Amino acid sequence: MKEPSIVVKGARAHNLKDIDIELPKNKLIVMTGLSGSGKSSLAFDTIYAEGQRRYVESLSAYARQFLGQMDKPDVDTIEGLSPAISIDQKTTSKNPRSTVATVTEIYDYIRLLYARVGKPYCPNHNIEIESQTVQQMVDRIMELEARTKIQLLAPVIAHRKGSHEKLIEDIGKKGYVRLRIDGEIVDVNDVPTLDKNKNHTIEVVVDRLVVKDGIETRLADSIETALELSEGQLTVDVIDGEDLKFSESHACPICGFSIGELEPRMFSFNSPFGACPTCDGLGQKLTVDVDLVVPDKDKTLNEGAIEPWIPTSSDFYPTLLKRVCEVYKINMDKPFKKLTERQRDILLYGSGDKEIEFTFTQRQGGTRKRTMVFEGVVPNISRRFHESPSEYTREMMSKYMTELPCETCHGKRLSREALSVYVGGLNIGEVVEYSISQALNYYKNIDLSEQDQAIANQILKEIISRLTFLNNVGLEYLTLNRASGTLSGGEAQRIRLATQIGSRLTGVLYVLDEPSIGLHQRDNDRLINTLKEMRDLGNTLIVVEHDDDTMRAADYLVDIGPGAGEHGGQIVSSGTPQKVMKDKKSLTGQYLSGKKRIDVPEYRRPASDRKISIRGARSNNLKGIDVDIPLSIMTVVTGVSGSGKSSLVNEVLYKSLAQKINKSKVKPGLYDKIEGIDQLDKIIDIDQSPIGRTPRSNPATYTGVFDDIRDVFAQTNEAKIRGYQKGRFSFNVKGGRCEACKGDGIIKIEMHFLPDVYVPCEVCDGKRYNRETLEVTYKGKNIADILEMTVEEATQFFENIPKIKRKLQTLVDVGLGYVTLGQQATTLSGGEAQRVKLASELHKRSTGKSIYILDELTTGLHVDDISRLLKVLNRLVENGDTVVIIEHNLDVIKTADYIIDLGPEGGSGGGTIVATGTPEDIAQTKSSYTGKYLKEVLERDKQNTEDK
């Protein structure tokens, strides 16, 4: 019988060249090829899109309005499709309420666990809060030694101010003879006058007994009487012993701290029943940050040390500041840091109740006199932020504020009541601070009573199962309370992967986009095993991937190419990895078999004395490390996932340099000092954030080449005759653009119960410009034709205009020759956006004093693309600039001049320097995981060179 398969015929999405392919079902299929070759077009835009469309089409119109309608992909037929699930990197929630625990649903089970077997404790007295029946109280008292004398007391006043005369009188009228007031037994008729300004505790003596058999009935009656008098509280005064406290309700018998019935919603920070009332469950509050208010403490007040009060059109605040300094004799020409602590406190937090009189010039002209209490700069910013009706003022004030942990819940997000419930010795706020590996260990060994164990058994099974899946995809270092908005694309994707395995679905088609991103080679095996486990459940996996190990582990490998863009879109080779390796036409096969490779450089640039020195870096999990980053060479920062690479490079290095060089308001991670910044004049962070958030932004506008192209069109004879200036050829301003679509080229049509539909503008036919503008041509092409050209085509078209050719060539050099000049920024992948940014920096003149910071540069890149990119980075270094890269890819690591390896583990087990030096030095370091894999690569490359 023929093996089941997915048969695709006539796929033409994007650059696909009418391809036919048969893919085996229930196998691990890896699709690879150059960046832009058409992998995603086949995997996501054809196979997944059709699988999803068919599923959605089977639903009712009502259900479809929530799921969105998908267009039919440009393909003749696809047979053998299963329901499709896509796990990509773009759907990370930026909601501050979303955490690793909530996304994976682990938190739902933890909440249930605390609601079912949690034990509430009084936060003031650290005693367990229990609700007890009268029978339980009797049993506990009868456990006392025989002949023990006891008094049953009803606490009617607990530590409250007042003389309480009326209450004492009422107790006497009810027939009670004795009271215990502040620990002393007194007759109800001889109570001394109580000081109404002091706290008092008054307890009614309900009964006096000797513990012996046969008193149970009398004891129960007396307990009931006491509980009625004191609203459910009872104190047993054991003569010559310690008092026993009992409570009929969930309340502390000493202070009355009460807690309602334990429910799962009580432990949710997204519910008003559980959230901290101060921060509404966010764990953080926007607070004025003194370091942003006074960013440069070497400045004097006259030089503008207090940044929010630097003079503007009104001199209200500068005049007030001057008057305050006169009154309190503060020298305005003294550096802020040299002022006394008292003087700084007055300026920042106010002068108390003392009123200050001053005269200031109004914005409209004229002077005005004011008398007011000086509130201080910090309270002033906070007040204006919270009370101002002006959006502009609030935005300006927010620049001087930062998110700090909430002072009530200390960042734990929950109410005091929720944090008073314990399971296995920890409250829920403490548990979610654990990393996944710590939490897994904790729940596997949790100590519960036999009864609680029986109740919690099924819940614990679910928690342990989900934690195990997360652990198996290399995420053991993530803490459960980590905000999902701070996760990298690869981490977010692996979390969704773990969630899918947890669902144990079978017969599903999963389409994944580079799940190995951000994963160290050490953790790759676990990821591959996870993928195989999903396959073994009876699912088909299509993985778009460039990672060597994943390609070798595939059951079926598809190489798409041979080039990118117009030069791609064909199946170059398909079959087992061994078959593809033998195929001479397959570029991927050549690299996999070692016939082609990225060579180790013949020499490495030595680390010079010029360096940036970071001392005492403590951001996130960094353990107060000292690091030197040599200048004018290529440094790669390595380490297992979660070892502290991003904390060091992005949080400490980049943000501190941005603060000093660019005068940025970002707040760096914690460190003691950084030296050597004066050797740099420019810092460029090339990350994967979009180059623009609107369809109007594109590679041509971002790199600035579109300005030069518009200049060329404005210089043509036709444009001069018509009097067209450069602005005529912009689609962002009135004049040359099509006014029907405002230069977008597309028009949005609202479909109400269906998703919005975008259709080409009928007036300009999607060209963005009006007819008159399009009549102006250069070498037979109008401005709209230029935007539809690929970068490669445009480079040839403008080869005689050096200024334009140089900028376009940099895009080709970074492997973006296949992208069209007018491609909407919103449709570029993270890796493509990153390379557009790199290209726009490349054509700028180098000062030799720039530092480039790149994070996971190889995302979405084939080995051949990486080879080209390394040449570009080396060009930057040859100019004297510094390149710092966070990277796991061994081809990049082996070509570095200098490596900083962090670790040894992830999360709390990381944050230290494992090794520094050349790749050869790291390869010899036995404690380095990176060194272990690097050694294999260097030896393999050496062997291949000798074989040749």
Curated annotation (Swiss-Prot):
Keywords linked to the UniProt accession: ATP-binding, Cytoplasm, DNA damage, DNA excision, DNA repair, DNA-binding, Excision nuclease, Metal-binding, Nucleotide-binding, Repeat, SOS response, Zinc, Zinc-finger
GO BP annotation list: nucleotide-excision repair; SOS response
Name of the protein this chain belongs to: UvrABC system protein A
UniProt-listed CDD domains: ABC_UvrA_I, ABC_UvrA_II
One Pfam family matching this protein: UvrA_inter
Family according to the record: Belongs to the ABC transporter superfamily. UvrA family.
Species: Staphylococcus aureus (strain Mu50 / ATCC 700699)
Localization (cell): Cytoplasm
